[in-house]
Amino acid sequence: MMVESKTPLLDTVNTPEDLRKLDPSQLRQFADELRTETINAVSVTGGHLGAGLGVVELTVALHYVFNTPADRLIWDVGHQCYPHKILTGRRDRIRTLRMGGGLSGFTKRAESEYDPFGAGHSSTSISAALGMAVGRDQLGHKNHVICVIGDGSISAGMAYEAMNNAGAMNSRMIVILNDNDMSIAPPVGAMSGYLSRLISSRQYRGLRELGKQVAERLPRPLQEAARRAEEYARGFVTGGTLFEEMGFYYVGPIDGHNLDHLLPVLENIRDDQGTGPVLIHAVTQKGRGYGPAERSADKLHAVSKFDVITGAQAKAKANAPSYTRVFADSLIQEAEADSRVVAITAAMPSGTGLDLFEKRFPDRTYDVGIAEQHAVTFAAGLAAEGLKPFCAIYSTFLQRAYDQVVHDVCIQNLPVRFAIDRAGLVGSDGCTHAGSFDVAYLGCVPNIVIMAAADEAELKHMVATAAAYDHGPIAVRYPRGEGVGLEMPERGQVLEIGKGRIVKEGTKVAILSLGTRLKEALLAAEDLNARGLSTTVADARFAKPIDEALIRRLAQDHEVLITVEEGSIGGFGSYVLHFLAQSGLLDQGLKVRPMVLPDIFQDQDAPAKQYDEAGLNARHIVETALKALGTGLAAETPAARA
């Protein structure tokens, strides 16, 4: 007996070309089936749920009205792209989302022609869309360029830079503001839907243009009065004055879940022959159509595998606290002892653990929104006034504020504390979120101190060290995930700046680890010792300043020195090699082997598999030592595999 499909319409659609064969009256059912498929898929894989559910109707309408992929459709960030992926020939692989060898959790150019621009970080879509629109015009093409950006992402400076530029140009592009927080929109309903359809219509645009031509014949004061009156009237009923002032033709707000509103507005804009940018303001609900996600939009923004009926997430029992939790608890402890400790996050309070800090110290917590550049300089201002700011930002997002780190913090030697979460490889979020580069891009800047926690106890000590350090900027990096299960000290101890530690003594091979590869270094030492190769293991603790006395000792007392780090080329290993070369410690035959992440962008997978692919596990350290000593052959290198 055949089981009746729960998605009969969706089963007939593999690409948007198939979708456009449906009658408009079928689209409501199609959207419901697409939402069901999205929920079922994410329940198996985990991922970003709420954002995608909020744009199901918008996704259907955009692909139905516009001729994708010839018409470019860009999704900002990419959190909301799962329905788009299902609809663009990837349904058969949707249950591989964020897995090794599977679909990326974000849009990705290499994955589909329907992903014209990749994402992962926020607020890039308007800039990319404008570039594509100008490129189209230069080449004499006629396709549309559309980008979808959320009300959170549009608050970032880059989005306003792009809008400011776009408003001064004649290139036609369409920006869809996906407002799922009601932070900008006035109430939506039948009247606003009618006004949006009216304002987007060719007749209205024609009358407006005629009015401008008539006004141009009036004396200049009357021209200005007419312009302001028209803007005031439109702003009164639509709320789009800000975007109009930036040079956009504003349409909205419209109900982003009402296909009867979406379709005619999009068709009107598609068919209009005008020039310049258009902004369509669509109000949506995050988690739409799935009760648990609607009730807890923040908790079901990003989820692990979950039960579709209850929404309960299947989280494995933790063997140790997460590094993020250890950081938060340690910072709370320091703040209880010192009222000058304050915390800054750039729209990631729960991701960085500062939601816990905020519960304890609401008046000492600052969420500045998606504004990493501002966050860093804001922290610099706090430090200049004698406070102790901890700026908690993921490694990958701190890249966005590099000039502020250099110009506003380090040149002025202001004591800003950087808590760099998600350092190293991050698993299912893939290359856009990997924290591979911070040691390299911070280590070349004067005045900054850089620490890397080997385990959760070390992280607690490093938070205490950062709180006590008032001589300039200081950073502590730590990974995503759980600690190693150590007994935690009651209080963090202040570490001596630039001093590492010997963890295991040996005589022939020295392994100098920075960060949480220390556990793998100790496992490698056990293997090497079992082979009769006495091995020292040291924890560098500091990437800058490096412990020159420790490195000198390791170089002079061992035949082989291996550095291991969860970072790119140009980082800690380079600093060690530079010191060894400058000190003449390479002149007596010391064999130095730096082990770093391969010089590639690694795709998503389980973190353990990523590090195995990167060649940074215990067996790789053993192979490196054996090859250096000439007593064994190393396995194929990550670079060769790539």
Swiss-Prot record:
Binding site for thiamine diphosphate: 79, 120-122, 152-153, 180, 290, 372
Residues the record lists as binding Mg(2+): 151, 180
Domain of life the protein comes from: Bacteria
Catalytic activity: D-glyceraldehyde 3-phosphate + pyruvate + H(+) = 1-deoxy-D-xylulose 5-phosphate + CO2
InterPro entries tied to this protein: Dxylulose-5-P_synthase, THDP-binding, Transketo_C/PFOR_II, Transketolase-like_Pyr-bd, Transketolase_C, Transketolase_CS
Purpose: Catalyzes the acyloin condensation reaction between C atoms 2 and 3 of pyruvate and glyceraldehyde 3-phosphate to yield 1-deoxy-D-xylulose-5-phosphate (DXP).
Name recorded for this polypeptide: 1-deoxy-D-xylulose-5-phosphate synthase
Organism of derivation: Rhodospirillum centenum (strain ATCC 51521 / SW)
Name of the coding gene: dxs
